Amino acid sequence: MREIGHFIGGKQVAGTSGRTSNVYNPATGEVQATVALASVEELRAAVENAKAAQPKWAATNPQRRARVFFKFVELLNKHMDELAEILSKEHGKTIEDAKGDVIRGLEVCEFVCGIPHLAKGEFTEGAGPAIDMYSIRQPVGIGAGITPFNFPGMIPMWMFAPAIACGNAFILKPSERDPSLPIRLAELMIEAGLPAGILNVINGDKGAVDAILTDPDIGAVSFVGSTPIARYVYGTAAMNGKRAQCFGGAKNHMIIMPDADLDQAVNALMGAGYGSAGERCMAISVAVPVGEETANRLVEKLTPKIESLRIGPYTDDKADMGPLVTKEAYTRVRGLIDRGIEEGAKLVVDGRDFKLQGYEDGYFVGGCLFDHVTPEMDIYKTEIFGPVLSVVRAQNYEEALSLPMKHEYGNGVAIYTRDGDAARDFASRINIGMIGINVPIPVPLAYHSFGGWKASSFGDLNQHGTDSIKFWTKTKTVTARWPSGIKSGAEFVMPTMK
């Protein structure tokens, strides 16, 4: 049985803790590997490697740091098929979806190729008599990232690319459910010219997370996962004096106005609701049609499309979606569907008993559609993280708008309409971080920042874009005056610009 270890000091190393976790093939339910779970001592080994390598890397000029990422982008493109297959084998998503996962991470690496410009400070000449003032950005030192299972390519690159480009060393703790791709990415970074010790990958469970959060040499932590764990990571990191950005759960709504192009909205809902089997923090899980006629037509058009979804293993290049990632995820999603029925929602399309011939033990759930869902129901409040779409009917625009505004989560939201006034009002008033206008999954591109509001985000700086440069650097402001500019002796009052 293959055992996946760690990546420390520029090479793969075997685990030494004696603790492991199984890595499953989601399509078959079979164990395909084990992954080592790091001890505190193994994390410290990674940190010591990072400490030794980081000062020289920070002193490397930004053009040379950028060249590593230019080469890394080239290698990602060269190895795209290999990377997608590694990802799909452990996660279960289709090959094309896996390529999209890697490509969105690649785009962040392209963005940080501009680090010579992005990390520039500010300068004020003549701030006072013969006084110049300037600010510089310097790396935090050692950063860490704790990433979820659902995007094992994109989200690690969200974190380590800007952190390393800014001159930091980095400790990555990926999900133990699909740990192979992050290690392969680390190997490619070394091939691209990154010095050993700058990027380390530690596999592990809560013990590894706690070791990261309490390690005195780690200065900043980035996290993506569920809201309860995001709160825990944020609070623990803060108590240990660390900068933290933590991103949690979501319940993303799409409002469909009566004037919307309904066919366009339906196609958007299919991709946004059922792509990646719904295991996306930006999946649309709630459709809010405005008016009974709009709702009836929407459900009528959605039903046959959901029933005809092609579901299969990653080796099926015609599959629309694959299995859920683990048996636990499968059981949880099935339980929430059952709960929705108990609460009185109408299950229009029931995919609970979907079985794929030859893959009967896989974690497949067919597409499901609930109608007549209300805000009091658990299936409305809870992030299901599966191929389940809930229809909540609204009688008018104001009622529709109030639904996502009152929800605990505030990650993403979308509106489909031909009315520019309604769209502008929506974008202005909604209390959610990422907004789509006739765009179903409003994930910002790499040069803008990604982040939600409310219980979807903890911390004041987002992922990628210019926020990422600010997060992974500290600002130092210098006020300089040379002797020829000193005209008077000691002063004992607060200096001001007279």
Question: Which positions does each model-derived feature cover?
Answer:
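Glycine-rich loop-to-alpha-helix module at the N-terminal edge of alpha/beta enzyme cores
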Residues: 32-119, 130
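A structural signal for short, well-ordered beta-strand elements
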Residues: 22, 36, 58, 91, ...
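Conserved C-terminal structural/oligomerization subdomain of aldehyde/semialdehyde dehydrogenase
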Residues: 28-34, 218, 255, 310-313, ...
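ALDH superfamily catalytic-core signature
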Residues: 228-374, 437, 486-488, 493-498
